[in-house]
């Protein structure tokens, strides 16, 4: 580029460099989209806009991609590196430039015909200034329409700092030429497909128009389901039809979101400022798979785990910056207090009560509102656990909203619904101190403005945040596979509950929890906490801690928990340095070196972070515990022991493997432990390696408390085979609390009611307890003896003496 064009672009770039602060999606286009910068790259934009072109150029230069203003030279021929699909509108409408996109596409394809080694990567790029979807009434022009020069000037002036450059996966022109030819009709088809691509991309980024709230309420009131519920309300409560209708409208006011794009923009500015000061980074993985689903027209339902009230804001912020529409979020009614309630409502929150029981009108209004969101094409987010996890582990799922999601499909007419499991991880959760108090029996404090201000005042260095998108679950595909005749239950009017609904919803919920855990994120904090809590003194020298972290990191990198899980790329030493900056640990220095200590008062709180990744390490920890106890053991006997205990672990921690997959996993882990020098393999036997016994023992300690808990329940069951399930849960908790006090077990989940409830249900499913309540004493004693070998003798004596004392 030379002469006047260079001067023109430089002059135009001056105001743009001040007014425009754009963000690239994805954040690092070349590696994330697999672009090969050694091969020619050309850019395709939807319509002629010099502002878009210069905004694209700034992002290309920032990410070491070719400059779109520099032409491509191929076989001595100079071609523009960018193509505008459409000339775009002009201020003076009588002047319409001739479109050149088809000619340029044809020129590029023709070069591939004459040069068999040429392979140009065509990268579609859209530049967006603002993403307001608009309202259903009152706007003649659609949002994100093509703008003429004057309109574009005002868009840049007002929305320049809310702009995104969206790079799409490249298309190989070599493949196009080889498979479809190079004539002009193929060039026309390419331009037509590109137009459709950009139209879909705009819809994925902006979403459908927002309804006028009153119009939405009127439509809901007119639905047959709500009309019938209003009649039933009037009849059952002996009130007038008008009064019952007012009750329904009041419920809609309580439930419905009041989405505002301007509030999204304002909050994005505030959160961007806040995150940069509180977090050292927010790590996002696998967002491209979600963008592709949105582009393909799927109705997206985000199903994250629930760690903190921060989840609502963090996930919406991340989705917005990934070029996706912030979802409508199901939030607990406890958050509907001033000023948080009105703010959350304008950010897309709709409010849900803890229980629907006994209120048919409420359940009908809520179900119809949710169905309306789906039918209009809005993305939705809800927390399938129902509440925030107090222990750091996933809670058993609550299936009410999930059931309504499938019922929405059974009304027909919705786009394909796809569930997106999401793992959210933190290095600091602001509520963790409150969680520990609640687990010890304190009453949950009601959410309020003073409580919110107290929480905000405590926000300091929060370390890193993690948002990992798990494997999507297309509901239609799932139902086709597991309930082939599900379409026979479609009823566009009534909410139906076919016989298959409840078991199917339960299976989907369990599968979602597994997929959330599959996307787990190991980080400096949870790895250091895992190692220090494994030490009985909660302290290790820096060398020991480094060695232990290397053990965890190598296990996770060389035998990954799943393809969606993430492990830090930093070294063990760098992770320790980062964790020490979080001010959770103490360091004692002496002449020999540093000792890193987890203070007693912090130990209980730090179990939360350890539990975030317990599922990723529990199997190697169990193997280490078995090998440590036996000193040497054959693979077959090791496999038998793991097989006995695995169903309990799988149910408790939502582990991913089926029983028939265990042999391969155990072999891979055993080989990795041998590679690390933790064990030696001789004649198909696993032996302890004495020179690395401490590392193996610390690895084994990761399963210690879980095995102690199982030992309690199996001993109680063996001692009293006719004990009923409720009493078994209660007595297990009592013994666990006693064990916790006598042996200094710091984990509050050690005697958590939900953990024992889940365990007892698994024992029934595995046949250790019959439906009549009686246990199989021979089987339970056999398992107890296996567990008794894996726990220390003093803990075993406490368990056995506690139950004898009760007898």
Curated annotation (Swiss-Prot):
Lineage: superkingdom: Bacteria
Short motif (HXXXXD motif): ranges: 305-310
Topology of this chain in the membrane: Peripheral membrane protein
GO cellular component assignments: plasma membrane
Keywords annotated in UniProt: Acyltransferase, Cell inner membrane, Cell membrane, Lipid biosynthesis, Lipid metabolism, Membrane, Phospholipid biosynthesis, Phospholipid metabolism, Transferase
EC annotation from Swiss-Prot or TrEMBL: 2.3.1.15
GO terms, biological process: CDP-diacylglycerol biosynthetic process; fatty acid metabolic process
Top EC class of this enzyme: transferase
A family per Pfam: GPAT_C
Gene Ontology terms for molecular function: glycerol-3-phosphate O-acyltransferase activity
Cell location: Cell inner membrane
Reactions performed catalytically: sn-glycerol 3-phosphate + an acyl-CoA = a 1-acyl-sn-glycero-3-phosphate + CoA
Pathway info: Phospholipid metabolism; CDP-diacylglycerol biosynthesis; CDP-diacylglycerol from sn-glycerol 3-phosphate: step 1/3
Family, as annotated: Belongs to the GPAT/DAPAT family.
Domain notes: The HXXXXD motif is essential for acyltransferase activity and may constitute the binding site for the phosphate moiety of the glycerol-3-phosphate.
PANTHER family: DIHYDROXYACETONE PHOSPHATE ACYLTRANSFERASE (PTHR12563:SF17), GLYCEROL-3-PHOSPHATE ACYLTRANSFERASE (PTHR12563)
Record HAMAP family: Glyc3P_acyltrans (MF_00393)
Entry protein name: Glycerol-3-phosphate acyltransferase
Originating species: Shigella boydii serotype 18 (strain CDC 3083-94 / BS512)
Gene (UniProt): plsB
């Amino acid at each position: 580029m030379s002469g006047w064009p260079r001067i023109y672009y430089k002059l135009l770039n001056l105001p743009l460099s001040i007014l425009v602060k754009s963000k690239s999606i994805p954040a690092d286009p070349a590696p994330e989209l697999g672009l090969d910068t050694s091969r020619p790259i050309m850019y395709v934009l939807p319509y002629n806009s010099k502002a878009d072109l210069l905004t694209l150029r700034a992002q290309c230069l920032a990410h070491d991609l070719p400059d779109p203003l520099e032409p491509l030279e191929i076989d001595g021929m100079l071609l523009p590196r960018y193509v505008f699909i459409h000339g775009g509108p002009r201020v003076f409408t009588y002047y319409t430039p001739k479109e050149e996109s088809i000619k340029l596409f044809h020129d590029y394809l023709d070069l591939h015909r004459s040069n068999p080694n040429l392979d140009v990567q065509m990268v579609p790029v859209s530049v967006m200034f603002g993403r307001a979807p608009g309202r259903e009434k009152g706007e003649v022009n659609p949002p994100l329409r093509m703008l003429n020069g004057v309109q574009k000037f005002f868009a840049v002036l007002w929305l320049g700092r809310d702009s995104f450059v969206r790079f799409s996966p490249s298309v190989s022109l070599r493949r196009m030429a080889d498979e479809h030819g190079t004539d002009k009709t193929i060039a026309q088809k390419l331009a037509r497909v590109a137009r459709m691509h950009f139209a879909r991309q705009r819809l994925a980024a902006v979403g459908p128009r927002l309804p006028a709230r009153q119009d939405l309420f009127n439509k809901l009131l007119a639905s047959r389901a709500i009309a019938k519920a209003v009649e039933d309300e009037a009849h059952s409560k002996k009130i007038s039809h008008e009064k019952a209708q007012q009750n329904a409208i009041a419920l809609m006011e309580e439930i419905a979101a009041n989405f505002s794009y301007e509030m999204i923009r304002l909050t994005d500015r505030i959160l961007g400022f806040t995150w940069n000061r509180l977090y050292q980074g927010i790590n996002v993985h696998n967002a491209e798979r979600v963008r592709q689903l949105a582009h393909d027209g799927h109705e997206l339902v985000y199903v994250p785990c629930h760690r903190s009230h921060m989840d609502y804001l963090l996930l919406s912020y991340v989705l917005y910056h990934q070029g996706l529409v912030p979802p409508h979020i199901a939030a607990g009614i406890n958050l509907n207090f001033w000023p948080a309630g009105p703010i959350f409502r304008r950010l897309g929150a709709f409010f849900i009560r803890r229980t629907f029981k006994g209120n048919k009108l409420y359940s009908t209004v809520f179900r119809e509102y949710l169905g309306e969101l789906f039918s209009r094409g809005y993305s939705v987010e809800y927390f399938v656990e129902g509440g925030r996890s107090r222990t750091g582990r996933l809670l058993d799922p609550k299936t009410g909203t999930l059931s309504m999601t499938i019922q929405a499909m059974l009304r027909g007419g919705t786009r394909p619904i796809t569930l997106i499991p999401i793992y959210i991880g933190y290095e600091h959760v602001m509520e963790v101190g409150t969680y520990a108090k609640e687990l010890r029996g304190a009453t949950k404090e009601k959410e309020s403005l003073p409580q919110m201000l107290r929480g905000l005042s405590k926000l300091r260095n929060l370390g890193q945040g993690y948002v990992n998108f798990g494997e999507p679950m297309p509901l239609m595909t799932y139902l086709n596979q597991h309930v082939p005749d599900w379409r026979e239950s479609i009823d566009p009017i009534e909410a139906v509950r076919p016989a298959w609904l409840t078991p199917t919803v339960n299976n989907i919920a369990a599968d979602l929890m597994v997929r959330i855990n599959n996307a787990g994120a190991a980080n400096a904090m949870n790895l250091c906490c895992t190692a220090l809590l494994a030490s009985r003194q909660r302290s290790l020298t820096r060398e020991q801690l480094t060695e232990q972290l290397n053990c965890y990191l190598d296990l996770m990198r060389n035998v990954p928990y799943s393809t969606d899980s993430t492990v830090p790329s930093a070294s063990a030493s760098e992770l320790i340095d980062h964790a020490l900056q979080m001010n959770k640990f103490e360091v004692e220095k002496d002449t020999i070196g540093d000792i890193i200590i987890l203070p007693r008062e912090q130990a209980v709180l730090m179990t939360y972070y350890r539990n975030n990744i317990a599922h990723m390490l529990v199997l190697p920890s169990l193997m280490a515990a078995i090998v440590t106890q036996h000193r040497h053991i054959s693979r077959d006997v090791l496999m038998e022991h793991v097989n006995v205990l695995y169903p309990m672990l799988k149910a408790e921690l939502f582990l991913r493997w089926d029983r028939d997959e265990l042999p391969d996993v155990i072999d891979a882990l055993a080989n990795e432990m041998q590679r690390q020098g933790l064990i030696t393999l001789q004649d198909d036997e696993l032996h302890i390696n004495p020179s690395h016994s401490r590392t193996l023992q610390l690895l084994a300690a990761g399963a210690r408390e879980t095995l102690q808990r199982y030992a309690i329940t199996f001993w109680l069951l063996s001692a009293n085979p006719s004990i009923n399930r409720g009493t078994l849960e209660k007595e297990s908790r009592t013994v666990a609390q006693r064990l916790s006090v006598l042996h200094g077990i710091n984990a509050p989940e050690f005697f958590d009611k939900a953990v024992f409830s889940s365990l007892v249900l698994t024992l029934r499913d595995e046949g250790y307890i019959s439906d009549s309540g009686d246990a199989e004493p021979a089987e339970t004693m056999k398992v107890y003896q296996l567990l008794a070998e894996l726990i220390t003798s003093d803990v075993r004596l406490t368990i056995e003496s506690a139950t004898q004392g009760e007898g």
